[in-house]
Amino acid sequence: MKSKERIILQRLNRAFLTNPLIESNYEYNRFDAENKNYIVEIKSRNNKYDQTIIEFDKFSYNLLYAKENNKFFVYAVKMNDKIYIFNITKLKEFNYNFNWEWREMPKYTEFNNTKNIRKLVGYINIEDATKVY
C-alpha cells in the first residue's frame, strides 16, 4: 500500500473505532484492507470527478472474495479532501449500471510506465456514495 492510501486508511479508521480496518500484508492483494465485515479497495485521485472508475478485475475478484468470506466489498476513493465510500456489494445487489467498457489505460498506475493496455472498466457516480468523509 502506498503512503497516500495509508493516510486514507487512518482517516477511515476514525469511523471504524470498534472494528478497525487492518492493512493487507500481501503486497499484490487486490484489496488494501479488511476487518470482520468489510474488504476495502482504496484509491486516491488528484482531481475530483463526477464519476470514479473501477477496474473489472478488482470488481469481480473482490466481490467473490467478499461473498466467500461473508463480507461487504467497499471501494473508498479520495478526491480532493473528501473520501467517497461505495458499497460495491450493495450496488451489485441493486443491479447498479456500471456502464462497463474497454478503455486504453496505463498498465501500471504507480509507476512511470507509459505503456497502455486495454482494461475493462466501470463507472460509479459520486452521488451514489454510501458515505462521504
Q: Where do the protein language model's features map onto the residues?
A:
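Beta-rich catalytic cores
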Residues: 29
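Acidic-basic catalytic patches of nuclease active cores, encompassing PD-(D/E)XK
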Residues: 1-25
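General helical secondary-structure elements
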Residues: 39-41, 54, 114
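Short glycine/proline-enriched coil/turn segments at helix->beta-strand junctions
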Residues: 17-18, 35-38, 69-71
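Conserved catalytic cores of phosphodiester-cleaving nucleases, focusing on short active-site segments
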Residues: 33-48
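Non-catalytic C-terminal interaction segments of nucleic acid-processing enzymes
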Residues: 11, 21, 25, 78-133
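Catalytic cores of nucleic-acid endonucleases
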Residues: 7, 20, 44-91
